[in-house]
Amino acid sequence: MSDNNQALKDAGLKVTLPRLKILEVLQQPECQHISAEELYKKLIDLGEEIGLATVYRVLNQFDDAGIVTRHHFEGGKSVFELSTQHHHDHLVCLDCGEVIEFSDDVIEQRQKEIAAKYNVQLTNHSLYLYGKCGSDGSCKDNPNAHKPKK
């Protein structure tokens, strides 16, 4: 039995072809932070006949089962990424829409200190930073615009 079959069963979901195909697409590195519509188009490009309503339904089921995490970035539409064991935060460029994942121990520690100051035990958190490209919006045409500086 494939790993994806087992992952669906472990999440309490029946193994179906649409669920398997959607999970396969979500596992592709270029499909992080993908909307339902983008995922649907990707499935069409791959020759899969899965309707948009099914894509929405499966993504909601995956979200409920903890297979994916739903994010609501600027712009109003939900995007999805596979749930991971490691925590990370997001930096979103308002010019091109690129979403950059990052982890920073100093930020994590500071959040814990703030919670402790107010006598709150953190159970979860998410941090979204929004900004505009430092290169006057030219990031839309430059695939390297958001590479980390050395």
Curated annotation (Swiss-Prot):
Molecular function terms, GO-annotated: DNA-binding transcription factor activity; transcription cis-regulatory region binding; zinc ion binding
Subcellular location, record wording: Cytoplasm
Protein family membership: Belongs to the Fur family.
Function according to Swiss-Prot or TrEMBL: Fur acts as a repressor, employing Fe(2+) as a cofactor to bind the operator of the iron transport operon.
Highest taxon of source: Bacteria
Example GO biological process: negative regulation of siderophore biosynthetic process
GO cellular component, one term: cytosol
Major location category of this protein: cytoplasm
Residues at which Fe cation binds: H87, D89, E108, H125
Name recorded for this polypeptide: Ferric uptake regulation protein
Binding site for Zn(2+): H33, E81, H90, C93, C96, E101
Region (Dimerization): 85-143
Alphabetically ordered keywords of this record: Cytoplasm, DNA-binding, Iron, Metal-binding, Repressor, Transcription, Transcription regulation, Zinc
Primary gene name: fur
Region (DNA-binding): 1-84
Coiled coil regions in record: none
Cystine bridges: none
Subunit structure: Homodimer.
Classification via InterPro entries: FUR (IPR002481), Fur_C (IPR043135), WH-like_DNA-bd_sf (IPR036388), WH_DNA-bd_sf (IPR036390)
Species of provenance: Vibrio cholerae serotype O1 (strain ATCC 39315 / El Tor Inaba N16961)
Classification via SUPFAM superfamilies: Winged helix' DNA-binding domain (SSF46785)
